[in-house]
């Protein structure tokens, strides 16, 4: 698959076939992802690739704590809730997803079930947890580096026919993840990525989120014309 085809074709997948992904394929994808650039080649990332019963325990723990009203316990969280144009885009993609799934605005049960899917990692057969070394906590560069490797990972997965969705729901109850994935205290849990073979019959998987135009995002300085 050509690079342009990967970038233009990739989408976030929220429905998966219950079909295992081999360790060999996952190692190949991670090897490609880790060619991502990092500040001064620090390579701050670690990956916890989880499947089977350990992943099921995380799903159960996440769901139980959320339903019990436990507060968000993410270890990496900066900034304020989205507002303005950023909030508009967040709401826009939510509307696309709800429309695809046939979930009405007043369908409280349907909306709750959709939210809980996220805490179950969208029932994907694999979850990848990205962490970084705690000694780098507060670094300006480390979040950027982890974002770069996550982007490389999801593109590498797509090029092999695998779907992904980068998400925060899977790590919102970080104590559960840390316990069942065996993550040491000297690492900070940053992000989760659900991964597996896409279920092409799952309506939300057909959603293509909108993007700003180059004209809206880029300023060209010193060019003629």
Residue ranges and their predicted role:
Residues 1-225:
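Acidic, surface-exposed loops and disordered segments
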């Amino acid at each position: 698959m050509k690079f342009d085809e990967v970038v233009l074709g990739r989408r976030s997948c929220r429905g998966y076939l219950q079909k295992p992904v081999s360790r060999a394929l996952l190692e190949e994808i991670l090897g490609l992802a880790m060619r991502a650039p990092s500040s001064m080649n620090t390579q701050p990332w670690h990956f916890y690739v989880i499947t089977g019963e350990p992943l099921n325990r995380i799903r159960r723990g996440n769901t139980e704590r959320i339903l019990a009203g436990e507060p968000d316990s993410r270890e990496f969280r900066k900034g304020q809730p989205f507002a303005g144009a950023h909030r508009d885009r967040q709401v826009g993609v939510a509307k696309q997803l709800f429309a695809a799934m046939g979930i009405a605005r007043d369908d409280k049960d349907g909306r709750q079930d959709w939210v809980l899917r996220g805490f179950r990692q969208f029932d994907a057969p694999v979850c990848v947890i990205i962490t970084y070394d705690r000694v780098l906590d507060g670094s300006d560069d480390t979040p950027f580096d982890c974002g770069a490797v996550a982007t490389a990972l999801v593109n590498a997965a797509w090029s092999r026919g695998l779907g992904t969705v980068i998400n925060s729901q899977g790590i919102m109850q970080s104590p559960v993840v840390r316990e069942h994935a065996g993550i040491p205290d000297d690492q900070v849990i940053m992000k989760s990525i659900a991964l597996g073979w896409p279920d092409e019959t799952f309506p939300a998987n057909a959603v293509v989120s909108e993007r700003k135009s180059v004209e809206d995002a880029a300023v060209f300085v010193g060019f003629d014309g």
